[in-house]
Every structure is written in structure tokens, then in C-alpha cells.
């Protein structure tokens, strides 16, 4: 019996083109593919990116997000001063600092013992000697292939039509994402960004994304009296 790299018996179905591969063949009902499909699912990381502007009550809501099980907060305030970001961090309870990633003003990572930095056009390089988490954004599958090996994780966007940016539409077909997952390009180190909401989580798991990054879907609910129920649902679906 031929084995896949994970030790599963390779698919013996004549219609399965994925023989001996790690990723199960979609639509194939053979026991090998079914077993691999179950085994390769994993809890997804829950990421929230801050609103680009400073918002009243923001730090209280951030504390609330972490209380509901948020894995990482990406602090993104383009155009802000280091003093403004420092003050925001001071208002966030210290117990959450190790779960915060900066998009700007990287020296604050050492000052507050933060989780990591997110490279971007404004800040394309990590500080010299930096030993924390490094992530970056990708807008094509080619970028993912290039940047994933040197990153702890990467964002791929836009996966769905943006909630917060009018006219910012999905850039990838479902077929292209499925192929990238089957090839192992989309994996635990690739997080989906762009229009992500609760309704998309099951699909993102099917596509092997390791995490989901939320922006507009979460921040538009900041003053919703039922937001706690929604946040609990997100945490449960991602687990």
C-alpha cells in the first residue's frame, strides 16, 4: 500500500488525482481522502486589525476582544505619530501586550514587549537584530510563495469584497484558492484578509487558511448591544 507523506494510505480511487499527496482530493469519497480531510483541519488564528483612525472607546473594545479569545491585534494607524500610538498602548491592559502586532513605529515593540511587527510599504524592514514575530501582506499567490518562507505568517488579500473599502473587490477565484490549497501554498501560515465575516469561516477552513483577519465586520459592531454574542460565535467557529 502506497503511503502519503503523513502516513495515510494513498487514495486508490481512479478519479482521484491526488494520490500520495498530503492534501485530500476534493469531491473524492475514498476513505484515504476522507481521513486526510478530517486530520488536516486545525484551529484558525483570530486576528483583528484596528480601524485606521483613532476611535472613541477603542481601547475598551480592544480589551473586550481579547476577553473573547482574540489571538492577535494588529495595530494599524497609518499617518499617526509615535506619541499617539504609545498613548493607545498605555491604555490597553498590559496582560494583552504580548498579543499586539505593530504596522508602524516598530521601536514601540521593545518598549511595551509586543508580539511582533507587520512589514508594509511604510515600514518594509524589521529593526536590526529584531527577534520577535514578523508578518507581511501579500496581494498575489506569487507573493505568498516568495514571502512565506521568511515570515511567521502572511496575510493574503483581498479574499472577499471589502466591507470597509468601497469598490475593493475580491482578487481571487475560488478555483485559484482551491488549487493553491491543494498545492500546499495556502496553509497554516497564510491568513485570509479582506471582507472576512462569520459567514466565510467554514469556506476558509475548507481552503486551509491558518487564520482569518477581521476589520470592518468587527468594528462596525462596536456599539451593537449583541456584539458579545457575535464575538463568542466567531471564537467558536474558528476553533
Regions found by a protein language model. Give the residues of each.
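Conserved, mostly hydrophobic/aromatic
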Residues: 48, 73, 109, 154, ...
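N-terminal active-site wall of soluble small-molecule enzyme domains
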Residues: 66, 70-130
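Catalytic cores of alpha/beta
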Residues: 102-115, 139-150, 183-186, 191, ...
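Histidine/lysine/aspartate-rich catalytic loop segments that bind and position anionic ligands
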Residues: 134, 140-165
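Cysteine-centered motifs
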Residues: 11, 16, 28-33
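Active-site mouth loops of central-metabolism enzymes
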Residues: 44-57, 135-136
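Glycine-rich phosphate-binding active-site loops on the catalytic face of alpha/beta enzymes
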Residues: 120-127, 155-167, 201-234
